[in-house]
């Protein structure tokens, strides 16, 4: 067994032990988010999970916050994107997707996110099926959600319909370090699919948290078709 003898050796030993604990915390949180990321596979469901971190203090006080994943299903604006197949969600299309219906959907989404948080809004909200930056800007700046000051990152996938995934985050609980899209190569003759979103951030306790937002094909056509 190694026993540090001088004050300098003791200080170095404490520093190395502290760094080791921080690395362990990062690994634990990473796997916590992997489990939460699996929940993104369930469309139309809202899944909330509590994540805990420890403050770097003598009391080891726990910091908890809520992580939510939600397939909000076809959050399109009312304008045609010539590069995407979004014709179904236009004012003169079969769904009559006009500005009034669009604003109502924004308000409904904002209301649900706020209600999930109860007294404390979710720190992280993974969203599936958002069309573009415009709808996220409207959701976070022009809906009741604007009071919560969410910021967001999103993918820009080659999906033919133009739907993407995104992550909303509270800046006072999650400091964004990086974000990137992970492309999924088309399999044989299959059409392009949605990218994965990988986001890294820093928690209040100094731990690093990695989040993966995924939106895999539905099984509406059967398991064999989706695979």
Residue map of PLM features:
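Bacterial N-terminal signal peptides
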Residues: 27-42
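Extracytoplasmic mature domains of secreted/periplasmic and thylakoid-lumen proteins
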Residues: 149-184
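Short, low-complexity intrinsically disordered segments enriched in small and basic residues
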Residues: 12, 45-46
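N-terminal secretory signal peptides that target proteins for export/translocation
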Residues: 1-22
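N-terminal, active-site-proximal structural segment of metallo-dependent hydrolase catalytic domains
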Residues: 46-147, 153-163
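Active-site regions of metal-assisted phosphoester/phosphodiester hydrolases
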Residues: 2, 48-95, 99, 170-227
């Amino acid at each position: 067994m190694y026993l540090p003898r001088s004050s300098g050796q003791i200080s170095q030993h404490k520093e190395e032990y502290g760094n080791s604990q921080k690395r362990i915390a990062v690994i634990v949180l990473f796997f916590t988010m992997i489990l939460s990321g699996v929940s993104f596979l369930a469309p139309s469901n809202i899944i909330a999970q509590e994540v805990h971190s420890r403050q770097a203090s003598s009391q080891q006080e726990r910091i908890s916050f809520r992580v939510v994943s939600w397939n909000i299903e076809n959050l399109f604006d009312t304008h045609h994107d010539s590069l995407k197949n979004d014709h179904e969600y236009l004012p003169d299309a079969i769904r009559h997707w006009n500005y009034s219906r669009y604003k109502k959907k924004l308000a409904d989404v904002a209301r649900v996110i706020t209600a999930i948080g109860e007294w404390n809004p979710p720190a992280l909200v993974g969203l599936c099926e958002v069309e573009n930056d415009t709808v996220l800007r409207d959701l976070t700046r022009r809906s009741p959600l604007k009071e919560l000051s969410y910021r967001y990152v999103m993918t820009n996938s080659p999906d033919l319909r133009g739907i993407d995934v995104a992550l909303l985050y509270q800046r006072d609980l999650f400091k964004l370090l990086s974000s990137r899209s992970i492309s999924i190569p088309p399999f044989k003759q299959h059409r392009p699919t949605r990218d994965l979103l990988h986001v890294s951030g820093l928690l209040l306790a100094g731990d690093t948290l990695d989040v993966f937002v995924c939106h895999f094909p539905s099984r509406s056509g059967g398991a064999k078709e989706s695979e």
